[in-house]
Amino acid sequence: MSESGDQDVPERIEVQRPIAADAAAIFAVVSSPEGHVQIDASGMLMSSTGEPATAVGDTFVIHMDREALNDYPLGLYDVTVEIVTYEQDREIAWTIVGQIKPQIGHVYGYRLEPVEDGTLVTSFYDWSDIHEDWKAMGIFPVISEDALRGTLGILDRTVRRGYPRPA
């Protein structure tokens, strides 16, 4: 309970899954715009434009359709992914920069840790620093723990199948 008597509500979700692949193979997927689309379990990510991230500040565009969530009729729209944490083969995190104001401020990401048979992948979604206007709406989290867990399963399958394939 908080001091005001309200029950504390978590503002971050983390899920983990061991994947039988090295961190470089996994990072190649999670740092790639097309990789994001390939592994999305929410059904919102339709396609992408841009190059794989290589540093903090890099951006790429994801073409979205929120219809899969059946909550807000936004139709087709684009968001810009801006990388806020980048450690090659270890961690990547990003925020979403959209056309709406104020910017939301939620962060998504992956941490990769070597383990005996591959890599332990942690997927996280953090909305603790969202703008107060958005916090007051009570619509967070946008993505559920189940969706994060599903994305890790798809990531595992995607890496096992050899994505991304060399050109």
Feature-to-residue mapping (PLM):
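Hydrophobic ligand-binding cavity/cleft-lining segments
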Residues: 1-56
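Hydrophobic pocket/interface hotspot
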Residues: 25-30, 36, 60-62, 83, ...
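A short, structured loop/turn motif at beta-sheet edges
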Residues: 20-24, 51-55, 84-91, 111-120
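Intrinsic-disorder/low-complexity, polar/charged segments enriched in Ser/Thr/Lys/Arg/Asp/Glu/Gln
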Residues: 10-18, 59, 78, 91, ...
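Short, solvent-exposed aromatic-acidic interface loops
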Residues: 95-104, 124-131
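Hydrophobic/aromatic beta-strand elements that line small-molecule binding cavities or substrate pockets
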Residues: 15-17, 78-85, 96-98, 106-114
